[in-house]
Amino acid sequence: MSQALKHFLNLTDAGGDAIAAMLNDALDRKSARAGQPKGKADADAPLGGRVLAMVFEKNSTRTRVSFDIAMRQLGGSALILDAGTTQLGRGETIADTARVLSRMADAIMLRTDDHAKVEELARHATVPVINGLTDLSHPCQIMADLLTVIEHGKALPGLEVAWLGDGNNVLNSIVEAAGLMKFNVRIGVPEGYESDAGMIEAAVLAGAGIRVIRDPVEAVRGADVVVTDTWISMGQAHAEAKLAAMAPYQVNDALMAHAKPDAVFLHCLPAHRGEEVTDAVIDGPRSVVWDEAENRIHAQKSVLRWVFGQI
C-alpha cells in the first residue's frame, strides 16, 4: 500500500487539524454554490472523472443519496453495489472485492454492520476507503454534525454536548470528535447501554471532558447541543426491555428546557417520533436536523477531497 494512500475509517485517521481544514472547506464550498441546482458540478470540478464505488450491506437513504450528490457536485460519479445483488452476497471475500474494485473505481465507500469488514477492505484496497457506517462508528455523520453546529454559530473548543439514549456508533464518533476538537460530552445513558470504553478513554486522554450521567436532566443541564438517535436498530433483540430502559431519556420539551436557551437539537435520522424524540422537539425552533441532513453532502465532499489529497 502506498504511503500516500488515505483512508477515512474513523475520525482519528484524519486528526484534528485535517478535520478543521475539511470543515472550513465544506463551509466555503457550500457558500460558493448557494442557489445552484443540486446536480450541477462545482465550478472547479475537483474530482472530474473520478468514480466512487459505494458498497451497501445495510439499507440507506441519507448515505446513499448524499455520497452520490457529493460526487456529482465534485465533477465525478458514483455507482451503487448492494451486497444482495453482487458476489459479496454469494461469498466473495472482502479482500478479493477490494482488489477488484480498486482496479475499477478511484475510491470505495462501505456501509456495513461489521467494522472489521471496512478495516479489511482498507488493508487490501489500493484506493482510498471511506466508512459510510459500521457498528462501531459513523465518522461521516459526525463531520456533518460538526459542520451544522459551526453554521449555527457555535465554536467547537469547550462546546458542551449532551447525548441522550443508546451508546451506539454515532455516540462513539462524537466521543472521538470531542478528543480531537477539544469539546465535552455528557452521556445520558441507562446502565448497560454505554458507548465504547476504549474510545472514551482515548478522548479523555486527548483532552475531552467525557462524563456518563444516569440522570437525563443533569446530562442536558446547560448544554449547547442536545443529540439523540434511534433506540432500536433493525433486527435488534430484546426491544421491549430496551425501550423501557430508554424511556426516561426521551428528548422532549421538558428536557430541552434544561439546556441553554440557544441550544440546538441534532438527530442523524431516521427518527422514531414518540420514542427517542417528540414531534414538538424535532419540528421545533431549536431543531437543526434538516440542515444536518443536507450537510452530509457538503461534509462528505470535503472528506472525499481529503482522501484524494486535495485538502
Curated annotation (Swiss-Prot):
Predominant cellular place of this UniProt entry's protein: cytoplasm
Reactions listed under catalytic activity: carbamoyl phosphate + L-ornithine = L-citrulline + phosphate + H(+)
Pfam families according to UniProt: OTCace, OTCace_N
Record has Transferase as a keyword: yes
Pathway: Amino-acid biosynthesis; L-arginine biosynthesis; L-arginine from L-ornithine and carbamoyl phosphate: step 1/3
UniProt keyword annotations, A-Z: Amino-acid biosynthesis, Arginine biosynthesis, Cytoplasm, Transferase
Name the record gives this protein: Ornithine carbamoyltransferase
Organism: Novosphingobium aromaticivorans (strain ATCC 700278 / DSM 12444 / CCUG 56034 / CIP 105152 / NBRC 16084 / F199)
